[in-house]
Regions:
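Polyanion-binding surface elements
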Residues: 1-17
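Major-groove DNA-recognition helix of helix-turn-helix-type DNA-binding domains
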Residues: 14-39
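A short, Lys/Arg-enriched interface patch at domain edges and termini
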Residues: 42-66
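Canonical protein kinase catalytic loop motif
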Residues: 333, 338
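Phosphate/dinucleotide-binding and metal-coordinating scaffold of catalytic cores
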Residues: 57-322, 326-328, 339-443
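Helix-turn-helix/winged-helix DNA-binding modules
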Residues: 1-2, 37, 329
Length: 443
């Protein structure tokens, strides 16, 4: 976010204001002048402070053969040009801004004249498979690839979560020829999670720790997602779908089904991003406006959404908060909710609810369930579940009577998983208690 003044940057870096201005002129610090005042990208200041280079002649890296120049594209729109060091995974610059309004949210300065290479690097890092995902280290060795940041380059950075991609500077490749929304992608004939990683596949740009794989079924792009030790997460996704179907409208949530794949139960859901749309995690939406001191995170996020023209955002957040409370979802972090933007019209709307698998006490060992409270620490706004529930204003959509029989349905469904032995009674009671409390709170 471009919000640091020269004086503040001077204090953070331990250098003079004159040196800060020199770093701005040289492009080391991304900054933009507004009303005669330099506003500096906070991430570039932090990166400079961590790097803290010594004195000496500037590096000749830009002339090295491992440095390549690319265009960041959004469908057929050229967004910006950048240089990338394949040996380190570092964005060296973003020196040519072409279409700032279609850039990834949060990397541009307020006037759209500068891009933060630090923010761009952070965005790209979360476009790659995290190193914590099971099997990725062995896959990197198999492919002879040094790090996960290299994987998206093997498929031009293409994704099924947005419309961004990269192409060599001066190339005449067209979006219609390469995108995964319209074109086939690699699908290995084996039911293994890492089979398509490193190939021409959207699996190269799938974020998140749990195993996942994109497949095409009867022309529909679907995401398969596994579970952990007890395989409870895929079942939880289907239970959440049942809950949503009782309380919400069809467009408010992503429907999940349970299938057998690779010898285990996995969840399957259709892609919720359309062929002209991108999903923007709340993390980036949160940086649209500067954080006002003492403003709570809920209010700040809602104000950022309003600034982008999103209608009824507090109603959408209320639906998320209430459903997460019923599901005891402890993993509603700032990357699995957010907004959908149409990259042609630049209109925003709330993203549908998805990724509710880490719920229903699935991370509590069976032997500890008897000593576990039904009320859990919630996210993303408050840990206190009751305090977070009190953020809900509009309840015109809510009919709790539609939840009659839901705890029984959920426990019966979980009984189909042999690993749920000695767990379903606790989950049934927990669901019923949460629903009973909501009746007391909302009537």
């Amino acid at each position: 976010m471009f919000s640091i003044t020269v004086a503040e940057a001077s204090a953070k870096l331990g250098v003079s204001p004159a040196r800060v201005r020199q770093l701005i002129r040289s492009g080391v610090l991304a900054a933009e002048q507004v009303a005669g005042i330099w506003l500096i990208d906070e991430k570039s200041v932090e990166a400079r402070r961590e790097h803290n280079p010594g004195r000496g002649r500037p590096s000749a890296r830009l002339s090295q053969p491992n440095i390549s120049r690319y265009l960041l594209m959004n469908r057929d729109h050229e967004v910006l040009a950048f240089r990338f060091d394949a040996s380190t995974g570092e964005f060296l610059d973003a020196d040519e801004i072409i279409d700032a309004k279609r850039a990834p949210l949060s990397i541009m300065s307020p006037r759209g004249t500068k891009a933060s290479k630090t923010a761009l690097s952070y965005w790209w890092c979360h476009r790659a498979i995290p190193k914590a995902r099971h099997g990725i280290e062995a896959k990197l060795v198999e492919l002879g690839v040094a790090d996960t940041y290299d994987l998206p380059f093997k498929s031009m950075g293409l994704s099924l979560s947005d419309q961004y991609w990269i192409k060599p500077y001066g190339s005449e490749i067209r979006w219609s020829d390469v995108n995964y929304f319209e074109n086939d992608f690699s699908e290995a004939p084996v039911e293994e999670w890492m089979a398509d990683v490193g190939l021409d596949s959207p699996d190269n740009t799938s974020d998140g720790v749990l195993s996942k794989r994109w497949v095409c079924r009867n022309g529909e792009r679907c995401l398969l997602k596994g579970g952990t030790l007890l395989d409870q997460e895929p079942y939880n996704e289907v239970i959440a779908t049942e809950l949503f179907s009782r309380l919400l409208s069809d467009g408010d949530y992503v429907p999940y089904t349970l299938i057998e794949w690779g010898g285990a139960p996995v969840s399957s859901c259709p892609n919720f991003v359309g062929p002209t749309e991108e999903f923007i995690p709340a993390y980036y939406v949160n940086e649209v406006l500067p954080q006002v001191p003492h403003r709570d995170s809920y209010r700040h996020y809602a104000e950022c959404c309003v600034a982008l023209g999103v209608e009824d955002i507090e109603t959408a957040l209320g639906k998320m908060i209430l459903c997460d409370d019923i599901m005891a979802n402890t993993d509603r972090h700032w990357r699995n909710f957010g907004l959908i933007r149409d990259v042609e019209t630049l209109e925003y709307r709330a993203a549908p609810l998805f990724d509710t698998g880490s719920s229903l006490w699935c991370r509590v060992p069976t032997r500890e369930l008897a000593y576990t409270p039904f009320v859990v620490n919630m996210r993303p706004f408050y840990e206190d579940a009751d305090r977070q529930l009190r953020l809900i204003g509009d309840t015109s959509w809510l009919d709790l009577d539609k939840l009659a029989g839901f705890p029984e349905w959920a426990s019966d469904f979980l009984d189909e998983n042999p690993s749920m032995y000695d767990r379903t009674d606790f989950i049934y009671e927990g669901l019923q208690k949460r629903i009973d409390f909501l009746h007391l709170l909302f009537g």
